[in-house]
């Protein structure tokens, strides 16, 4: 209403108003408003230098306030606000206090601070705060619009995070890239389910209630499920699948057998799914397993200049014959790994690209924004078009040959080759590649054929030891093989040489690509850190991010770990 303002870059840091304002220009910022209450007591001599106290076991926090305490907490049954949108006018007003709702926190707080039962209450304040579906704030350049930056959704810790977040966002705006790996708060971690405000609200209320609860290893969200399901969801569920969720997708984590509890029981020790994952792991090494990996993010890059565009973006060579599979990283200007994926040359002017489920928005944005100006190449998302069944293990070839008339022998279908084959009348792109370190194929096929192909594979393979397997077995298998995972082991702060992936960089060619100068500079100067894999002799449960000490001095950290 104040007219138009032209600017080169725009930053939206509008708190709970950010979502609605961004939506007016087609940008999705997944946050919602939740009522948050805290109490201010009368003065009872609290020292002004009292440190802030948090008691996660009792879901509460406390800080000094003019000789008294300001205290509150995060109840498990948070109250959403502004379900129909933030009313106008509303300028940081307070909401009506809800004493009955706050009573549950009072009961938790009294054993920790008994004095609260004796002192008077000045106020119970209730105000709306913006919260996000995963409890992390939102930073970065919006994937929908170039030069539009977001800083919002601070989950009631904006003051604590403000200095660091402000510095990071300022450098991101000034330099066009974040100063370091900010994936946990990157706006591109969100995807299609986050377009639905009701879904976001459901998940956000769960995250609000877990603000102070125990963060268990491998803990899954419970709300907003099931959302995205592969065609095999019901079949796998009836076979004992225990599902996890990634970007809205239901994915089989492990399979319970008769007599086993088909749900996760969280612990810092050996979890209840350990034996099930061990069975699946053993089958992959000795017979064969079938994974439903339909949730893979999948793109097609096509156009007369597709090869030229991908040669610039990818660190590995992609000027290879049709049918060749290329494993590659995509680097930033510092040589850091922004994407870790595979691409298949399906035609002279077309590539089929697959990447991890959780990186669908991030990787699509990275590829599309780095197609050089003036080149005729288009990137489209085909994730929902294709199902993916991954057949891995020593008996994989025997099983696959039983269900197709196409020759899948090593001589006809070697590693690194993708071929069109037919299974039960289904046109299938059979990609000879593996993330578990065994013989196998990723079978990419139209979703309507998934159930048919699954049935025929299981019927043919069961006598040879084929069994269902889930994502937790994929994790243990790839760890055993030493395969890297983006956002855990590698990322924007790690170069290919540091990650042990220098062999996948086309430095022996004269082809220009993004990040080449940084890789060359590091090779000339030498690396100062490197990724290593190792085992421990003792039966110790590790989850990742533990510190590594050598001779009493910190020398590194665990990026991933398994048992």
Where does each model-flagged region fall?
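Central beta-strand plus flanking loop segment that forms part of the substrate or channel wall
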Residues: 25-48, 104, 297-300, 387, ...
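C-terminal catalytic lobe of FAD-dependent flavoproteins
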Residues: 57-58, 66, 88-228
């Amino acid at each position: 209403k104040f007219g138009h303002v032209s600017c080169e870059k725009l930053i939206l840091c509008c708190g709970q108003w950010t979502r609605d304002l961004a939506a007016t220009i087609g940008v999705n910022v997944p946050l919602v408003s939740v009522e948050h209450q805290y109490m201010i007591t009368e003065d009872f001599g609290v020292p002004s230098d009292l440190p802030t106290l948090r008691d996660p076991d009792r879901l509460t926090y406390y800080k000094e306030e003019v000789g008294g305490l300001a205290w509150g907490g995060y109840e498990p049954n948070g109250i959403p606000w502004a379900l129909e949108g933030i009313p106008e006018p509303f300028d940081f007003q307070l909401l009506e206090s809800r004493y009955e709702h706050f009573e549950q926190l009072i009961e938790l707080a009294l054993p920790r601070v008994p004095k609260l039962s004796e002192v008077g209450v000045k106020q119970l304040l209730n105000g709306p705060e913006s919260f996000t579906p995963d409890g992390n704030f939102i930073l970065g350049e919006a994937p929908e619009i170039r030069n539009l930056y977001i800083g919002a959704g601070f989950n009631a810790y904006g003051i604590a995070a403000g200095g660091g977040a402000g510095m990071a966002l300022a450098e991101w705006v000034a330099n066009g890239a974040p100063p370091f790996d900010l994936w946990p708060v990157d706006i591109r971690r969100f995807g299609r389910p986050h377009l639905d405000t009701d879904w976001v609200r459901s998940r956000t209320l769960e995250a609000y209630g877990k603000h102070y609860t125990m963060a268990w290893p491998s803990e899954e969200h419970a709300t907003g499920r099931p959302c995205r399901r592969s065609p095999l969801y019901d079949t796998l569920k009836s076979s004992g699948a225990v599902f996890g969720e990634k970007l809205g997708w239901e994915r089989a984590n492990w399979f319970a057998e008769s007599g086993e509890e088909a749900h996760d029981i969280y612990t810092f020790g050996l979890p209840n799914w350990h034996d099930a994952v061990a069975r699946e792991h053993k089958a992959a090494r000795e017979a064969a397993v079938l994974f439903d990996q339909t949730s893979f993010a999948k793109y097609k890059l096509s156009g007369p200049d597709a090869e030229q565009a991908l040669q610039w973006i990818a660190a590995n060579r992609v000027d290879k014959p049709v049918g060749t599979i290329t494993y590659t990283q995509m680097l930033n200007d510092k040589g850091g790994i922004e994407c870790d994926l595979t691409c298949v040359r399906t035609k002279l002017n077309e590539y089929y690209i697959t990447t991890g489920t959780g990186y669908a928005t991030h990787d699509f944005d990275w590829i599309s924004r780095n197609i050089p100006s003036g080149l005729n190449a288009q990137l489209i998302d085909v994730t929902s078009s294709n199902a993916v069944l991954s057949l891995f293990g020593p008996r994989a070839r025997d099983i696959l040959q039983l269900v197709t008339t196409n020759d899948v022998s090593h001589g006809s279908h070697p590693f690194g080759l993708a071929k069109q084959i037919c299974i039960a009348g289904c046109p299938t792109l059979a990609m000879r590649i593996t993330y578990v370190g065994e013989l196998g194929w990723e079978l990419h096929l139209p979703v309507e054929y998934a159930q048919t192909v699954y049935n025929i594979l299981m019927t043919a393979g069961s006598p040879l030891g084929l069994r269902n397997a889930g994502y937790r077995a994929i994790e243990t298998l790839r760890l055993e093989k030493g395969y890297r995972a983006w956002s855990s082991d590698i990322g924007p702060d790690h170069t290919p040489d540091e990650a042990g992936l220098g062999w996948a960089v086309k430095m022996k060619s004269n082809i220009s690509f993004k990040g080449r100068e940084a890789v060359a500079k590091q090779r000339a100067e030498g690396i100062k850190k490197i990724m290593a894999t190792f085992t421990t002799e003792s039966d110790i449960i590790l989850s990742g991010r533990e510190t590594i000490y050598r001779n009493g001095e910190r020398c590194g950290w665990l990026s991933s770990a398994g048992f």
